[in-house]
């Protein structure tokens, strides 16, 4: 019984500790206009990519932004060009989805044990780039993710208070036509634990 409650408490704590960092992946997001768009995370945090989305017919289908996203090495990040060996990480290819924008999520695990999954390390940086699927514009969209830890590839001597808080992408930024809002409800981690509690109690002999 004590083991059960300890496990449940550990689950609640781990869910509550994880942060979600949202990035609106489209060319009208001004954060992509800089060459060093960076998100700071910790192990077990999530990265949520919000794909381009159009809620009306003001943009021709051929001009709607659609992307293939890659997780690449630093050299490919600088060139904004994936190698043939780089497998596509995600596809943003439903710009008119009725349920709202597609959300693609990455969890920064230390070790997953799955062959096709990526293991992430503290103190390392990881790089995402995209290539357009149909539209002609070939603007480079790229993102650097730095995982907090003992070793950092790009240490800063005097990080300011804002950087210490590991900021996510600003959800209030004014992003243009390719972003919509999903009506799907979101549950906080504690709410998930409360919902799971009755089911887990039924399993106790």
UniProtKB/Swiss-Prot annotation:
CDD domains: Ephrin-A_Ectodomain. SUPFAM superfamilies: Cupredoxins. Pfam families: Ephrin. Gene3D superfamilies: Cupredoxins - blue copper proteins. InterPro entries: Cupredoxin, Ephrin, Ephrin-A_Ecto, Ephrin_RBD. Residues 1-18 form the signal peptide. It comes from the Eukaryota. Disulfide bonds join 51-92, 80-140. Its main location: membrane. Monomer. Homodimer. Forms heterodimers with EPHA2. Binds to the receptor tyrosine kinases EPHA2, EPHA3, EPHA4, EPHA5, EPHA6 and EPHA7. Also binds with low affinity to EPHA1. This is Ephrin-A1. It comes from Bos taurus.
């Amino acid at each position: 019984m004590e083991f059960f409650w300890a496990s449940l408490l550990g689950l609640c704590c781990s869910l509550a500790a994880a942060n979600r960092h949202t990035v609106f992946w489209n060319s009208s997001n001004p954060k992509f206009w800089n060459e060093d768009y960076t998100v700071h995370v910790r192990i077990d945090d999530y990265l949520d990519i919000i794909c381009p989305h159009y809620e009306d017919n003001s943009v021709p289908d051929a001009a709607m932004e659609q992307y293939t996203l890659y997780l690449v090495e630093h050299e490919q990040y600088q060139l904004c060009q994936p190698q043939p060996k780089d497998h596509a990480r995600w596809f943003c290819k439903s710009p008119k989805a009725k349920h709202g924008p597609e959300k693609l999520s990455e969890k920064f695990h230390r070790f997953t044990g799955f062959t096709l999954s990526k293991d992430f390390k503290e103190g390392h940086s990881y790089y995402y780039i995209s290539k357009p699927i149909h539209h002609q514009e070939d603007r480079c969209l790229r993102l650097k993710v730095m995982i907090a830890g003992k070793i950092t590839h790009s240490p800063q001597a005097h990080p300011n208070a804002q950087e210490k808080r590991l900021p996510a992408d600003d959800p209030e930024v004014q992003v243009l036509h390719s972003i919509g809002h999903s009506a799907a409800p979101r549950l906080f981690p504690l709410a998930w634990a409360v919902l799971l509690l009755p089911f887990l109690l039924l399993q106790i002999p």
